[in-house]
C-alpha cells in the first residue's frame, strides 16, 4: 500500500492534460454489453475502477484489448455469463450499471450489491423500481440482485419512469436498458450530468434513438439491435475542478488541456468570486491565482448538476481552509461526506460540523502532518491541503485516489509540486 509525501509551499505552473472522465468511462464500458459487435473507446482513463470493471467484463466472457496508451476495444459478442459476483464488485459502486444492459441483451442478470466509497448508503431501490416497470422481475437474495424478464416476455418493454429522487446511475441504467426495449421509454426527473449526455451520444452512435439527453426528460425509442461504434470519453470535469482548486490554493498559472469550462460553471463561478482568474479557452481552461491566502473564502451548497457538485465539495473546502474569512458549506447529496474534516483539523484547519453543514474559518497557514484518506474525493482534498501546508504532509491509504485520478501525483509533479509516491 502506497502513500504520498508532499512538501508544500510551491506555486504551480505549466500544463496538465485532463483525462477521460471516470463517471463517463464506467457506464460506457457497460454500454458495450448491449451489442454483439466490437466497441472502441478512446481517451479511457487508467484508473483502478476501470481495471475492476474490465475484470468484471472479462468474467462475463467479454473480450478486451488495450495497448499501452491507445484505444480500448471491447467485444461482447461471446458474452456468456450475465453475472457480477461480489468479489469483483465489492470495491466499486458503478458495478450496478451492468444490470440494465444485461437484462436488455440477455434477459437475465445476477449482480451482487455493490461497494465503493463509504460516503453514504446510495440505495439501489430506484434501479429496481425502474427496471421492474420495464418488465423485469427482480429479487434481492443473499446480497445479490437476481433479475429476469417477466413470464412470457422476450424483451424489456418501454415505460414511463419517474424516480423519487434524482439518480445518476439509475438514469444511466434505464437509458441503456431502454435502447433495446420494445416501444418508447420516457425518463422523468432524469439526472442531467454531462457524463449522461456523453453516454447517450455513444448509444446514438451505436444506433439508439434518444432525445432530450442533458435535460430532466429523456425519450428513448427502443430498437431491435445496436451495432458497434468508436467513441471518445468526455474530459473529466471533476479532475479538472480538482486541479483548478489546487492551483487556486497554491498560486500559479496552469492550463488544463482538454478541460471543459462549460461543465464546471458552478465551481468556476465560486473560484472567480474568491479572486482567482479562470478563463475558458478553445483548448481547455486556464487558471491564474495569487494563492489561497489572498483569496476570499466561499460558501456553497451541493446540489445535482448543474449545481455545485458533491464530488468537488472536499477539494473546495481545502481551499477555504487557507482563504480569508469564513465559509459555510452545506452537503445535500450524501450523508457522511465530511469525513475529511478530521484530517484537515490535523493540518491546523478550523472547521465546525453540525450535521450536513460545515463552517470553515480560514487560517493563515496549515502545517504538514500524516493524514489518512477516507474516500476518493477526500484523498484529493488532503493532497491540495498538503500542497499549501508548511513542511511535509504524508497522505496514507491513497488507493482511494487511484480509483478516480489518472496519475495525479505525476501530473502535479509536472507543474512544479514537490510530491512523490512511496511504499507505506
Swiss-Prot record:
Phosphoenolpyruvate binds at residues 22-23. Its main location: cytoplasm. One of its GO terms (biological process) is peptidoglycan biosynthetic process. One of its GO terms (cellular component) is cytoplasm. Gene3D superfamilies: Enolpyruvate transferase domain. It holds the Pfam family EPSP_synthase. UDP-N-acetyl-alpha-D-glucosamine binds at residues 93, 122-126, 311, 333. Its EC number is 2.5.1.7. InterPro entries: Enolpyruvate_Tfrase_dom, Enolpyruvate_Tfrase_sf, MurA_subfamily, RNA3'P_cycl/enolpyr_Trfase_a/b, UDP_GlcNAc_COvinyl_MurA. The active site is at 117 (proton donor). The keyword Electron transport does not apply. It comes from the Bacteria. CDD domains: UdpNAET (cd01555). GO terms for molecular function: UDP-N-acetylglucosamine 1-carboxyvinyltransferase activity. The modification 2-(S-cysteinyl)pyruvic acid O-phosphothioketal is found at residue 117. It is found in: Cytoplasm. It catalyses: phosphoenolpyruvate + UDP-N-acetyl-alpha-D-glucosamine = UDP-N-acetyl-3-O-(1-carboxyvinyl)-alpha-D-glucosamine + phosphate. Keywords: Cell cycle, Cell division, Cell shape, Cell wall biogenesis/degradation, Cytoplasm, Peptidoglycan synthesis, Pyruvate, Transferase. Pathway: Cell wall biogenesis; peptidoglycan biosynthesis. Belongs to the EPSP synthase family. MurA subfamily. Cell wall formation. Adds enolpyruvyl to UDP-N-acetylglucosamine. This is UDP-N-acetylglucosamine 1-carboxyvinyltransferase.
Amino acid at each position: 500500500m502506497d502513500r504520498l509525501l508532499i512538501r508544500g509551499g510551491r506555486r504551480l505552473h505549466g500544463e496538465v492534460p485532463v483525462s477521460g472522465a471516470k463517471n463517463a468511462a464506467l457506464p460506457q464500458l457497460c454500454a458495450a454489453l448491449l451489442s454483439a459487435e466490437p466497441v472502441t473507446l478512446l481517451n479511457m482513463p487508467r484508473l483502478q475502477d476501470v481495471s475492476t470493471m474490465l475484470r468484471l467484463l472479462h468474467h462475463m466472457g467479454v473480450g478486451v484489448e488495450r495497448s499501452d496508451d491507445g484505444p480500448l476495444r471491447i467485444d461482447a459478442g461471446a458474452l456468456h455469463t450475465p453475472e457480477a459476483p461480489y468479489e469483483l464488485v465489492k470495491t466499486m459502486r458503478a458495478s450496478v450499471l451492468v444490470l440494465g444492459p444485461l437484462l436488455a441483451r440477455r434477459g437475465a442478470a445476477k449482480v451482487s450489491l455493490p461497494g465503493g466509497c463509504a460516503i453514504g448508503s446510495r440505495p439501489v431501490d430506484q434501479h429496481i423500481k425502474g427496471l421492474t416497470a420495464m418488465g423485469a422481475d427482480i429479487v434481492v437474495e443473499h446480497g445479490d440482485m437476481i433479475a429476469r424478464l417477466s413470464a412470457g416476455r422476450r424483451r424489456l418493454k418501454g415505460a414511463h419512469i419517474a424516480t423519487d429522487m434524482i439518480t445518476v446511475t439509475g438514469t444511466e441504467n434505464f437509458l441503456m436498458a431502454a435502447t433495446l426495449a420494445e416501444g418508447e421509454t420516457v425518463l422523468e426527473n432524469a439526472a442531467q450530468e454531462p457524463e449522461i449526455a456523453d453516454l447517450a451520444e455513444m448509444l446514438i452512435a451505436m444506433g439508439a434513438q434518444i432525445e432530450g439527453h442533458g435535460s430532466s426528460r429523456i425519450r428513448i425509442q427502443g430498437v431491435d439491435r445496436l451495432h458497434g461504434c468508436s467513441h471518445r470519453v468526455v474530459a473529466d470535469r471533476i479532475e479538472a475542478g480538482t486541479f483548478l482548486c489546487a492551483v487556486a490554493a497554491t498560486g500559479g498559472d496552469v492550463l488544463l488541456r482538454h478541460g471543459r469550462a462549460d461543465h464546471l460553471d458552478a465551481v468556476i463561478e465560486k473560484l472567480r468570486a474568491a479572486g482567482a482568474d479562470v478563463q475558458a479557452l478553445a483548448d481547455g481552461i486556464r487558471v491564474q491565482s495569487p494563492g489561497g491566502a489572498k483569496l476570499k473564502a466561499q460558501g456553497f451548497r451541493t446540489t445535482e448538476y448543474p449545481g455545485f457538485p458533491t464530488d468537488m465539495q472536499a477539494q473546495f473546502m481545502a481551499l477555504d481552509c487557507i482563504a480569508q474569512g469564513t465559509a459555510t458549506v452545506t452537503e445535500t447529496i450524501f450523508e457522511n461526506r465530511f469525513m475529511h474534516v478530521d484530517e484537515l483539523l490535523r493540518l491546523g484547519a478550523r472547521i465546525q460540523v453540525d450535521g450536513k453543514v460545515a463552517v470553515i474559518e480560514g487560517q493563515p497557514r496549515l502545517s504538514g502532518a500524516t493524514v489518512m484518506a477516507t474516500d476518493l474525493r477526500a484523498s484529493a482534498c488532503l493532497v491540495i491541503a498538503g500542497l499549501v501546508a508548511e513542511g511535509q504532509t504524508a497522505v496514507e491509504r491513497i488507493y482511494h485516489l487511484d480509483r478516480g485520478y489518472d496519475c495525479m501525483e505525476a501530473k502535479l509533479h509536472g507543474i512544479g509540486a514537490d510530491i512523490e509516491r512511496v511504499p507505506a
